[in-house]
Amino acid sequence: MKKFDNLGLDNIKEIFHNLSYDELNAHEKANNEGLSTDNDTFCVDTGIFTGRSPKDKYFVKQDPSSKYIAWGKINQPITKELFDKLLTKAKQELSGKKIYVQDAFCGASLQSRKAVRFVTEIAWQAHFVKNMFIRPSQEELENFKADFIVYNACKCINEDYKQDGLNSEVFVIFNVEENIAVIGGTWYGGEMKKGIFSMMNYWLPLENKLSMHCSANVGEKDDVALFFGLSGTGKTTLSTDPKRRLIGDDEHGWDDEGVFNFEGGCYAKTINLDPEHEPEIYGAIKRNALLENVVLRADKSVDYADASKTENTRVSYPIEHIENHEPSLKAGHPKNIIFLSADAFGILPPVSKLSKEQAMYYFLSGYTAKVAGTERGITEPQATFSACFGEPFMPLHPTVYARLLGEKIEKHEVNVYLVNTGWSGGSYGVGKRMSIKATRACINAILDGSIAKCEFENFEVFNLAIPKALEGVESTLLNPINTWLDKNAYAETRDKLAHMFVQNFKRYEDVKEGIEFSKFGPKI
């Protein structure tokens, strides 16, 4: 117990430190934290919050980090005094109880990884951490020294939030200088995952390494592909490919040696999960995986079509559950980069080839649709712009990440493509969602290099290069104008979306790069 004195907890009844999967499973059952499915996958409810609470996330405003953080609606400041008050409150919540302490690494690169210690009173949250982060070896655990500590006091709420000037009873706070995060009022496991991701997005660029919200895989010829996109755009699904080894499904770094996963697991959406379309993910849901907010039938089988709790049903599992994963969790420099957008307006083509400058423009734009349930208050797709395809997790100015990406694209001669996994034939409510089959055909053509041999035409207003024909995709789909019955509505919607891009990009024109790249966007 003595080695845990620095946690600042009083009268701890018992500490369960780095439990095995079997031990965690036994604790989950003994604590009545959820149910087991028909194939012995444990299944939990995350309570009121079935997605992240972005309006309740704060960074402590203090030097030296305050001069690097891009303060605003996303990176909200909080005082050191208020942080101390809420940390004390969280520690009081965790004191006098049985607690779970789970140690893990974030980052598969030895030169870039961080050692993180998670403290919680809920067994399934320790299980989630064990699934999602990199599991240290026995020797590494014996010599483990935490770079960062996360106190997850999910049962603790801040009743004084109004007088404290905060958004709600929920709080997710990061103290960069003290290397501590504290979570209160939400049980959603994704807060821990994305919280440490946010910290990696602070640390790495300051070391001239790029941190990315993307998935990554590697082919038989060691050709690496990166897939950028917000939650629900298909990153996990499209990067899970039987012909390619999965490096990771969500968070990566890119340094002088190549690409490396931050995580040791995957966090996949399960709504309408179909074993035919997504056999790898379906097969990964077995003992040691952890299902969130799904509905069980009477026979304990999972009804993946049931969204009565949330559209954002999820499963976390160790990456070893994907048969075809890259065991080292890292690879060389990318050959192809794919930006995924779920276009709710049905305007963007299924696939477009981007120049380096256009790549910077669309990376900074980060256009997609927020898909139902990945955040509180979103019940249907809503068009949005999220810098770097992950603005909620980027503490620094977006152009810091864009500059690093541009340098790496140029240095390693990377091909960049924009792929629309959203709507075709009309906007949301009129058109239909692009089929996974068509999207897969576009991705395959990029990865096998056959798209480079296509004849391209210009997609007007957006000035994107789109293929005239592509194997496995109906030719009418390739140019969106052909899929809309009402051509006037199409032109009107196209111009409306182009205008939104232009308006959004004005926020970057306070810096040199922003002005430079603005000319590579749509021309109204």
From Swiss-Prot:
Binding sites annotated in the UniProt record for Mn(2+): 194, 213, 250
UniProt-listed Enzyme Commission number(s): 4.1.1.49
Keywords in alphabetical order: ATP-binding, Cytoplasm, Decarboxylase, Gluconeogenesis, Lyase, Manganese, Metal-binding, Nucleotide-binding
Family per record: Belongs to the phosphoenolpyruvate carboxykinase (ATP) family.
Matching InterPro entries: PEP_carboxykinase_ATP, PEP_carboxykinase_C, PEP_carboxykinase_N, PEPCK_ATP_CS
Needed cofactors: Mn(2+)
Cofactor details (free text): Binds 1 Mn(2+) ion per subunit.
Binding-site residues for ATP, renumbered to this chain: 194, 213, 229-237, 278, 314, 439
GO function terms (MF aspect): ATP binding; metal ion binding; phosphoenolpyruvate carboxykinase (ATP) activity
Localization in the cell: Cytoplasm
Any one GO biological process: gluconeogenesis
Reaction catalysed by this enzyme: oxaloacetate + ATP = phosphoenolpyruvate + ADP + CO2
Pathway it works in: Carbohydrate biosynthesis; gluconeogenesis
Enzyme class: lyase
A GO-annotated cellular component: cytosol
Binding site for substrate: 52, 188, 194, 314
Function: Involved in the gluconeogenesis. Catalyzes the conversion of oxaloacetate (OAA) to phosphoenolpyruvate (PEP) through direct phosphoryl transfer between the nucleoside triphosphate and OAA.
Protein name from the UniProt record: Phosphoenolpyruvate carboxykinase (ATP)
